[in-house]
């Protein structure tokens, strides 16, 4: 390792894999030799190895090739696909799935038993509750006027048991209410009430049918 990392895993596949700084890896993890663990973020690039904070990875996690930046925390039984990225100061709860090419930017807070499918993008500051499903290539945003005006981060909040379909787009600063269902390809420009369906471009809302008014089947 690089620095003062701590590992108690029996199944760590290290090879030449760099583990940066004070990273802490839990028990019974599988970590691929091409993963970057505790990679220094911009403010740490010039620090010595022992000064890099490192990241935390919970017990029984499966980490395939990708990057977990320093100061990120992944809960127990995290599973990833390939080429994922979790940036600094982001916290992810227990039992989450991060699919191939998923990007979770800095300062995000993700709950327990979430499932983010291939290519999903989660921008800076996003707050996600428990049992949230985000489909392939869904895109959350946090800046209404990118590079045209001074950057104003407007994070999105996604409450418990929300499902977001593939290729959906959520505009900055919105709240997606508990149990809401966002249809594939929808462009959401307004807050979505709890237990409502949003579909279309721009999305329009209707109440969910009774058979969909129940928690997501994640973490079972």
Per-segment meaning from a language model:
Residues 15-17, 45-48:
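Extracellular beta-strand/beta-solenoid scaffold signature
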Residues 49, 152-153, 210:
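Short, solvent-exposed loop/turn segments at secondary-structure boundaries
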Residues 42:
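Extended basic-aromatic, gly/pro-enriched interface segments that bind polyanionic ligands
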Residues 194-218:
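Conserved beta-strand-loop-alpha-helix hinge in the C-terminal portion
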Residues 1-4:
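Acidic/polar hotspots within intrinsically disordered regions
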Residues 15, 20-21, 27, 32-33, ...:
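Left-handed beta-helix
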């Amino acid at each position: 390792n690089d620095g003062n990392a701590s590992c108690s895993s029996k199944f760590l596949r290290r090879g030449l894999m760099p583990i940066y700084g004070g990273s802490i890896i839990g028990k019974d993890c599988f970590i691929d030799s091409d993963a970057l663990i505790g990679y220094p973020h911009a403010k740490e690039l010039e620090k010595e190895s022992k000064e890099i904070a490192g990241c935390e990875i919970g017990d029984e996690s499966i980490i395939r090739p990708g990057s977990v930046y320093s100061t990120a925390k992944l809960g127990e039984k995290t599973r990833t696909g390939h080429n994922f990225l979790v940036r600094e100061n982001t916290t992810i709860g227990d039992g989450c799935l991060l699919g191939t090419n998923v990007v979770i930017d800095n300062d995000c807070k993700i709950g327990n038993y979430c499932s983010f499918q291939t290519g999903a993008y989660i921008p800076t500051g996003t707050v996600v509750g428990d049992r949230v499903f985000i489909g392939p290539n869904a895109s959350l945003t946090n800046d209404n006027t990118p590079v045209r005006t001074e950057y104003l981060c407007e994070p999105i909040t996604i409450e418990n048991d929300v499902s977001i379909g593939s290729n959906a787009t959520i505009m900055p600063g919105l709240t997606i209410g508990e149990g809401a269902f966002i249809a594939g390809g929808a462009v959401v420009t307004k807050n979505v009430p709890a237990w409502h369906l949003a579909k279309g471009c721009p999305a329009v809302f209707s109440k969910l049918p009774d058979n969909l008014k129940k928690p997501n089947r994640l973490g079972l």
